[in-house]
Amino acid sequence: MMKKISIALAFALAAGPLSAADLGGAALKVGSDTTSPPMEFIDTATGQIAGFDVDVVNAICAKINCTAEFVTTGWDGIFAALDQGSFDMVASGVSITEERQKVMDFTEPYIINGQAILVRAADQGLTLDDFRTNGKKLSAQANTTDAELATSIVGDGNVLAYDTFNASVLALKNGDVDGVVINGANGPAYDKEFAGELVVGIKDLQSDPLGLVFRKGDPNVAAFNEGLAEIKADGTMDALIAKYWAVQ
């Protein structure tokens, strides 16, 4: 039997009724910051955008009769680009927060993400208390719930936030910070990518529900919620979670 990696990944809400939505073959553009494996990334073998979020959106589109074209967009401008109509939706591991819900619409959660802290391999014994009480510094990508969590742990004065995740990793490697707050869903990929140098040392922190994002008032939200309920009900979502996070 397959066992899911313990990074607080779980179904978000019970499955609802089967979809009756039909978007009539609509071609939707989807903004995504493709630097966050396995959620979304550039497949080096094909040059194509791939990942869990891509598969989820495509699976929903198969249920509600639409197609998705993914567009790489930097996180720092992704919501402004959505608002300006550069694309129709965002699928980029976006946490659902009250502040964001004031200015954009979300689907129901499609997965729950438990945040984690990436540290240097030599420091993998660090605990959360070490960060809270010993003047340790944290980094995270700016304008994310990761950055908010970092501030809550070590205080604003001990957080270095960068526009890109790669800049945060460089700060960790250079010794400018002692850890980087990340989406726990990305942890296994980072353990593999940075093996021997960096490691996910602290896991299962704050749990964030993730949702697909639309402009305020977009009627497609209802259709995507129906499609999401259907892929939860028919086992598709289980299969996708197993594809990216389960181990034998």
Residue ranges and their predicted role:
Residues 77-80, 93-102, 149, 173, ...:
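A ligand-binding cleft/hinge motif common to bilobed small-molecule-binding domains
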